[in-house]
Amino acid sequence: MAKYGLYKTFPDLWLQECPAEWEAVKIKYLFSERSEKGYPNEPLLVSSQNIGVVPKEVFGNRTVEASKDLHLLKLVQIGDFVISLRSFQGGLEYAYYRGIISPAYTILVPGEKIDGGYFRYLAKSVRFIELLQMCVTGIREGQNIDYMKLKNHLIPVPSLEEQKKIAQYLDWQVSKINRLIEAKKKEIVRLTELKKTVVNEAVTHGLNPNVPMKFSGVEWLGNIPAHWTTIKLRQILHPFSEKNHPELPLLSVVREQGVIIRNVEDKESNHNFIPDDLSGYKMVKKGQFAMNKMKAWQGSYGISNYTGIVSPAYFIFDVDFENLEYFHYAIRSKVYVNFFAQASDGIRVGQWDLSINKMKEIPFIVPPEDEQNAIVEYIPVAFAKYDEAITTLTEEVDILHELRNKLISDVVTGQIDVRDIEVPDFEYVEETEDESDDDSDEDGVTVDEEV
C-alpha cells in the first residue's frame, strides 16, 4: 500500500518517524480531564478492553457490585475516553454511553484538534499501548497508569480532515476483518455445542441404541436405559471444609473447563479481587468436587485434578463414586446443569444462589461399571474431530486479530497513506465480546456459607 512522500522524526516522540505534514502534540493539549460527580441516577458503566465503556447490563455479570455511594462515581459522556485499571494492557476505552464509573478511573474529553474516531484507533494500537506501559506505576495487582506522566507525552496528530478519513477507512477495513472473525467464532460455538451433545447423549442413553428404555421420572429428561439405576446426589457428595492453607496454589472454577490453576500474574483475567490473606480460602484436594454455588446454574463446577485453595464462598465435597472421570463428564453435562438451575434461586442478574438442600435431592443416573468405562473411553475419541476443527478456527481468529492490529497500527502512525482511497458505503461490524468463562469469586458473595 502507498506510503507518504516525506517523513520526519521528533526527538521526544515514541514513534521512529511520522509523515512530515503531521504534528506531534502533548496529550495534555489535546484533552481535558473530566472529574464531575454527583450523578447517582445515571446508569452504571463498566470499562471493557474489547467493547469499550458500556452499561453494566450490556457487559454482563462479570463485575463486582457497585458501591452504594453512587454520588461519588465519575460522570462519563458519550465520546469520552477512559483510562481504566487495565488500560496499560489493552489501551484506552471509548465511551459509547453516558453514565457513571469508578472514581479510580481518569476521564479524558477530546478537544477541537483531535477526532474521537481517529484517537479511538490510536489508543488501541500496539505502539500506543507500549507507551502506556512506560507510564505504569505500582506492582502486580496495584499497577495503574500515571496520567501525570502520560499527559506529557507526544502523540502523532494529522490534520482534522485526515484524522476523520483515517477513522472512516479503518471502520471499513476493520468491519471486513470482524465479519470474518465473527463467522469463525460462530462456527467454534456450534462445534462446542456439538461436543456437549456427545456427552449428553452418552450419559443419558448410553452407547447402545438398541437396549430397552424406561422413563427416567423427569419429564424433560425422558427415557434412560432400563438397566441403569438412579440415586440422589446426597448419596455421592459429602461436604468438606478445611481452611488455613494459604501456601497452596490458587484455583478457579470456570464454566468451560471446571477446576483450573489460576494465573495470578495475568491481570486481565484476574479482574476479581485477590486478598493478601488467603488463610480463609477453602482447601480443595485432588479428586474432590468443587462448585461455585452462585454459578452452578451455568456449569461452574467439576472434579479437581489439583490440590489448592478456592474462594470461601464455594462448596467443596468428597465424592463417593468409583469412576471419578465418568462422574465428572456426567455431572458437567447439559442434563445436570439444568438440574442445578432448578435448584438455584435468583438473587440478582447473572447470580443464582444454589440451595444445598435442593441440590442433595438431584437424581444421578448410574450405568453399570463397564458402561461407565466405555463411555469414558468413547468421549475423547468423539471429541477429537471437533477439537481439531476448533483449534484450526481459533488459530485463524488469532491470525485475523494480528492482521487487524497491524493494519490499525500502520494507518494511525502514518506508515500507510489512505488519503486517496475511496471508501464505499458499508455496514460497520463490531467484534462481539466473548462470553466470560472467568472465576467470579467476588460477584457480591461475601458470606462464607458452610455445607
Residue map of PLM features:
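Amphipathic alpha-helical coiled-coil/heptad-repeat segments
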Residues: M1-E17, E21, P158-V211, V366-V451
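Non-catalytic DNA-recognition/assembly elements of restriction-modification systems
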Residues: Y4-Y39, L160, K164, F215-P246, ...
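A short glycine-rich beta-alpha junction/loop motif
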Residues: Y7-F10, L85-R86, G99-T106, I139-K164, ...
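Sequence-specific dsDNA recognition surfaces
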Residues: T9-D12, V25-I78, R234-K286, T432, ...
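Ligand-binding loop in jelly-roll beta-barrel domains
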Residues: P110-D115, V319-N323
